[in-house]
UniProtKB/Swiss-Prot annotation:
This is Ketol-acid reductoisomerase (NAD(+)). The active site is at H107. Involved in the biosynthesis of branched-chain amino acids (BCAA). Catalyzes an alkyl-migration followed by a ketol-acid reduction of (S)-2-acetolactate (S2AL) to yield (R)-2,3-dihydroxy-isovalerate. In the isomerase reaction, S2AL is rearranged via a Mg-dependent methyl migration to produce 3-hydroxy-3-methyl-2-ketobutyrate (HMKB). In the reductase reaction, this 2-ketoacid undergoes a metal-dependent reduction by NADH to yield (R)-2,3-dihydroxy-isovalerate. Binds 2 magnesium ions per subunit. Its cofactor is Mg(2+). Mg(2+) 2 binds at D190, E226, E230. PROSITE patterns: KARI_C, KARI_N. GO terms for biological process: isoleucine biosynthetic process; L-valine biosynthetic process. It comes from Thermacetogenium phaeum (strain ATCC BAA-254 / DSM 26808 / PB). Mg(2+) 1 binds at D190, E194. The gene is ilvC. Pathway: Amino-acid biosynthesis; L-isoleucine biosynthesis; L-isoleucine from 2-oxobutanoate: step 2/4; Amino-acid biosynthesis; L-valine biosynthesis; L-valine from pyruvate: step 2/4. Keywords: Amino-acid biosynthesis, Branched-chain amino acid biosynthesis, Magnesium, Metal-binding, NAD, Oxidoreductase. NAD(+) binds at Y24, G25, S26, Q27, S50, D82, E83, K84, Q85, G133.
Length: 332
């Protein structure tokens, strides 16, 4: 594994170049401000009069349309949602590419699954922070950084890796360390983690536990505390020191239950299903399914989302969180 740090990156590779950050959302606001504070010339783009456009103005940027930003920039970072990138590229970016420009991504979906196929005379690389935008910004302001991934898909200039590392340094990532990967590896592992563990896996586990207790006659409020609320306490321990630290920190009773019962939940059948999910990602089955779902107006996505929002755990959770003044209400 190759890891790059500050001493491996040189901001001079960005001298005389303009970086366009298209999409002033979570990552966009952080990366653009960090680059600017590192002395890089930055322009930002979003939808005129949108909330993001106004936020960019509040941050002392003069936002442009995507077409204008792509025309002006030498390095173009695309930070709009995956499902919108291909159309944005076709309509606003591709017409403004010229030999020697560079395209940057923070997720490899559209390049890996060939929804975006750049011409051969541009550089294509990835800088992917492993943390949300607000953390990328806060760590930079505190003189630290968020670990990130770097990958080069196309090296027309012969300097794509140096450009990528300079970009990573500009957002503060090389302070923490930047791990070299590929678009394929980043895309497939990211999707698998979301589907099998971080989002799909954990939500189904939480809800299955909640339903089991409620169906057995226990109060929904107690089930919520035991299966969802306390999840943060455990995840924080794992996040800070790994599984071993979590096990060291919990009671012996809890650890014994973990060691003897956990494998009855995640069985060999579960592991086989995980392999199937990974294969669907590797073969492009999931990507085609998701792209088609967007093309026809997201009927399955919207129906499933409505159904999930009406689950008992949501209404119980909303009521209980109202008892917790330390929780800030998030606007979704």
């Amino acid at each position: 594994m190759k890891i790059y740090y500050d001493q491996d990156a040189d901001l001079q590779y960005l001298d005389g170049k303009t970086v366009a950050v298209i999409g002033y959302g979570s990552q966009g606001h952080a990366q653009s401000q960090n680059l600017r504070d590192s002395g890089v010339k930055v322009v930002v783009a979003d939808i005129p009069s949108s909330e993001n456009w106004k936020k960019a103005e509040e941050a002392q940027f003069q936002p442009l349309t995507a077409d204008e930003a792509a025309r002006e920039a030498d390095i173009i970072q695309i930070l709009v949602p995956d499902e919108k990138q291909a159309a944005l590229y076709r309509e606003s970016i591709a017409p403004n590419l010229r030999p020697g420009k560079a395209l940057v991504f923070s997720h490899g979906f559209n390049i890996h699954f060939k929804q975006i196929v750049p011409p051969p005379d541009v550089d294509v690389f990835m800088v992917a922070p492993k943390g949300p935008g607000h953390l990328v910004r806060r760590m930079y302001e505190e003189g630290a950084g968020v670990p990130s991934l770097v990958a080069v898909e196309q090296d027309y200039s012969g300097q794509a890796l140096n450009l990528a590392l300079a970009y990573a340094k500009g957002i503060g990532a090389t302070r923490a360390g930047v791990i070299q990967t590929t678009f394929k590896e980043e895309t497939e592992t990211d999707l698998f983690g979301e589907q099998a563990v971080l989002c799909g896996g954990i939500t189904e586990l939480i809800r299955a536990g909640f339903d089991t207790l409620v169906d057995a006659g226990y109060q929904p409020e107690i089930a919520y505390f035991e299966c969802l609320h306390e999840m943060k306490l455990i995840v924080d321990l794992i996040y800070e020191g790994g599984i071993s630290t979590m096990r060291y920190s919990i009671s012996d009773t809890a650890e014994y239950g973990d060691l003897t019962r956990g494998k009855r939940i995640i069985t060999e059948a579960t592991r086989e299903e995980m392999k199937k999910i990974l294969k669907e990602i590797q073969d492009g089955v999931f990507a085609r399914e998701w792209l088609l779902e967007n093309q026809v107006g997201r009927p399955v996505y919207n129906a499933l989302r409505r159904k999930e929002q009406n689950h008992l755990i949501e209404t119980v959770g909303a009521r209980l969180r109202g008892m917790m003044p330390w929780l800030k209400k998030k606007v979704i």
